[in-house]
């Protein structure tokens, strides 16, 4: 056998066949060639590795998809909570006009607590004044003498009725016809004057005049020791009424009546106020009158509305 044949047969193995039907023989078995680069993995191993990597990646995506909705809900809830807190602090800040525009949250809360305590004290004071007025009115009703007398109407009128005039002099029923009309009216006037003198806050001026001042947004009408403010401002301006009440409190004024009406563009405020009676003597000592206080308040309202 030559060298070429030996080299050509190196890739084959010779084996002995042990089959029963033949007496013996040889069988050539092909031998698989050895890999030329044993360091590189086979294609099957690479496929298996890729498949395992894909499975692992799919498992991670599934977990991410399961956790993602809860995380988004948590983010949305936190965002809404912060937005609600900002709105609440903004509304609370609008109710406190004495604070600067850029006040921190702690300052807003402290000022709100102080304002609430001050309002509670004011409420207690007003309740005491109300109770005193009720006691005074009940006492004056019990001490005022009244006279009941009958009068004789015509035949076409209703039966004899009972009247309660304000008079301190009893009148006999038989002297009703002879009682002069002028004397009766004089008694009525004198009784009314005596009753008016017992009022807690009487009006000193017998004749009351109306004085009116007007500007673009403010109309002031003064009647005695009371004033009527007509205010017209653009709608959707927060804190207007609160600022007006704060200004009244600054000048020791009490709000007796307030009405608010609005349309699509404007809001109208009608406020009846008076100077606190306990502060009138202090104003007179400072050389100021009630009218001067009302005018000063109106001027500050004009400046405030012009800045809106």
UniProtKB/Swiss-Prot annotation:
It comes from the Eukaryota. Disruption phenotype: Small and shriveled seeds. Retarded growth of the embryo after the heart stage, but normal morphogenesis and pattern formation of the embryo and endosperm. Shrivelled collapsed seeds. SMART domains: HLH (SM00353). One of its GO terms (molecular function) is DNA binding. InterPro entries: BHLH95-like, bHLH95_bHLH, bHLH_dom, HLH_DNA-bd_sf. Keywords: Developmental protein, DNA-binding, Nucleus, Transcription, Transcription regulation. Residues 69-119 form the bHLH domain. Pfam families: HLH. GO terms for biological process: embryo development ending in seed dormancy; endosperm development; regulation of abscisic acid biosynthetic process; regulation of DNA-templated transcription; seed dormancy process; seed morphogenesis. Siliques. Not detected in roots, rosette leaves or flowers. Expressed in endosperm cells. Residues 60-76 have a biased composition (Basic and acidic residues). The keyword Nucleus applies. Its main location: nucleus. It is found in: Nucleus. The keyword Nucleus applies. Residues 1-76 are annotated as: Disordered. PANTHER family: BHLH DOMAIN-CONTAINING PROTEIN, TRANSCRIPTION FACTOR BHLH95. Homodimer. Transcription factor that controls embryo growth. Regulates endosperm breakdown and embryonic epidermal development. Regulates the expression of SBT2.4/ALE1. Involved in embryonic cuticle formation upstream of SBT2.4/ALE1. Does not seem to be a general regulator of endosperm patterning. May control specific signaling pathways that coordinate embryo invasion and breakdown of surrounding endosperm tissues. Required for the production the embryo sheath, an extracuticular endosperm-derived structure at the surface of the embryo. Acts upstream of KRS. This is Transcription factor bHLH95.
